[in-house]
A protein has these predicted regions:
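Beta-propeller blade-edge and WD-like acidic-aromatic loop motif
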Residues: 6-7, 13-32, 58-79, 103-125
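Short intrinsically disordered, low-complexity coil segments enriched in acidic
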Residues: 1-9, 167
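Non-catalytic accessory segments flanking enzyme active sites
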Residues: 11, 42-46, 56, 77-166
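Short coil-to-beta transitions that initiate beta-strands within beta-rich domains
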Residues: 1-4, 38-49
């Protein structure tokens, strides 16, 4: 609770999804920062000078986690992590940089240092040896899919076909 802010941010599910709310110290709601059919995973950093909040959310896909930045009033929201996948980030105290550790179904863990203006500074871990091993080895990749359940809820999943998959053959 920074003294100069005179307010605080809270992640709450009061609208049915986990979203960020901005309150004054008397408990009065100033504004709802995020809205929509997605979940905010957590608040990563505040830039008090620029009045920006950095947060991780599932916006776009429930199977992914991305870093976003928005103004305290919720405007000017922008996704910062460019690659698809599950991102785990650490934002610098001044809000200028972030360390991004991510992977997805076709990319082993990558670790990169970025500016919050969108410039990659350094790829620290690329797992090139893992990528080379996958290319040389008989490997069945995961395939993502989604469907709508009987209650209308969208569900995501993946399947792995046999390496020698034959679409004309029947499988158990």
């Amino acid at each position: 609770f920074p003294d100069e802010l005179k307010s605080f941010f809270l992640v709450s599910e009061s609208d049915g999804y986990a979203h960020i709310y901005h309150y004054d110290y008397d408990g009065n709601l100033l504004n709802q920062v995020t809205k929509g059919d997605f979940e905010v995973i957590g608040i990563d950093a505040l830039d008090l000078k620029k009045k920006k909040i950095y947060f991780t959310s599932t916006e776009g896909s429930s199977t992914e986690r991305h870093l976003y930045v928005a103004k305290f009033d919720g405007s000017s929201k922008k996704r910062l992590t460019p690659e698809p996948g599950q991102h785990s980030v650490s934002v610098s105290p001044d809000g200028k940089y972030y360390l991004d550790s991510y992977s997805n179904v076709s990319t082993p863990r990558q670790v990169e240092m970025w500016t919050t203006k969108g410039k990659m500074i350094e790829k620290m871990v690329d797992n090139q040896s893992v990528l080379e091993f996958i290319e040389k080895t008989a490997y069945a990749a995961k395939e993502l899919f989604s469907f709508t359940a009987s209650d209308g809820q969208k569900l995501d999943g993946y399947y792995i076909k046999p390496i020698d998959f034959d679409p004309g053959k029947s499988y158990p």
